[in-house]
Amino acid sequence: MNLHPTTRIRFFGVAAYEIVTRAGVRILMDPFLDENPGSPVRSDSFDKVDLVIVSHAAYDHLGDTEAIAKRYGCPVIAGGEVRAYLAAKGVPTTQVRATTWGIRVKVAGVEVQPVECHHWSQIKMPDGTFASGVPMAFVVYADDNVRFYHYGDTAIFSDMKLQAELYKPTIGCIGIANPQEILARNPMPGEMMTGEMSPYEGLLASQWLGLHTVLPCHYCQADDDDVRAFMRHHAAAKARGERTPDALVLNPGETIEVNTLGRIVSPKAA
C-alpha cells in the first residue's frame, strides 16, 4: 500500500469536515453540503466516500447523509434516532452502525470513540412523528498521532478534562459561532445570543481537551465576529502564559495537512 505522507483535513463550513487518512480512506463528518451557503463542495463531488459519521439529527449536521449513503453505498456511524430516520428514508439498516457514548466502534478500518455531548437531537420522521436520541461528540482515530475530536454541537462541561485524559485528542473542531445564514432558516421569537459555546468557552474547552491544534467552527464565512473574538481570547491566553493549542481559522474548502508526528505542516497555525 502506498501511503500519503500526511493526513488531510478539509473544512466545508459549519461543522462539516473531510478526513483523508494516509491510506486514502475518506471520512465525512456531519456532511452538511448541498444547502450549506459556505461550502464549495456538494454531496456528489467525491469520487468515493468510505465512511460518514453523524453527531446528531440537526439538519445542519445530518445534512446530506441520506444522499451520500445512497450514492456511494458507504457505511454510516450515528445514533439510534439517525439510524431510524435513514431507514425510513430507504437506507438499509445494515449500512448504519448505531452507537452512543462510550461504545467505541471500528468501521471501514477506522476506530471512532463516541463521547458525551451536551446538546439535543431530534428529527421529524417521514410519517410526521418525531424521533429523539442522544447527541454525540466523537474522537476519530484517523492515523498515528492524529486523533480528531469533533464537538458535535456540545456546550462546555468540565468532564472534557476526563475525555482528554482517556482519549487524548490531538486536533479538534470547536463550535464558537452562530451563523445568521443558518439561523434565518428557522425563525423564532427573541434573539439567540451565543451558539452552544461562546468564543471564550470554546477556547476554554480546547484547553481542557488538551488539543494540540484547535479549529474554531460553526461558521459559514471565516470573516465572522465570533471567530475574531475567539482569536482575541486565544491571543490573550497565550500572552498570559496559559497552555493553549495552536489555532487555525479555515475558510470553507481549505485543507490542512498533518504529518506522522501529529504536527500541522500546512498551513501555519497561530
Please name every model-derived segment.
Residues 81, 155-254:
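Cap/insert and terminal regions of metallo-dependent hydrolase folds
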Residues 1-26, 33-37, 115-118, 162, ...:
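Zn-dependent metallo-beta-lactamase
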Residues 18-58, 63-67, 121-130, 154-166:
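Pre-active-site segment of Zn-dependent metallo-hydrolases
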Residues 108-117, 127-129, 259-270:
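Short, surface-exposed amphipathic charged segments that create phosphate/polyanion-binding patches used
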Residues 114-146, 154-159, 167, 171, ...:
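Active-site-proximal loop/helix segment associated with metal-binding centers of metalloenzymes
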Residues 2-7, 20-27, 104-113, 142-148, ...:
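Beta-strand-turn-beta hairpins that frame and shape the catalytic cleft
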Residues 41-104, 109-125:
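Active-site HxH/HxHxD metal-binding segment of metal-dependent hydrolases
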Residues 31-33, 57, 117-118, 152-154, ...:
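Active-site metal-binding loops of divalent metal-dependent hydrolases
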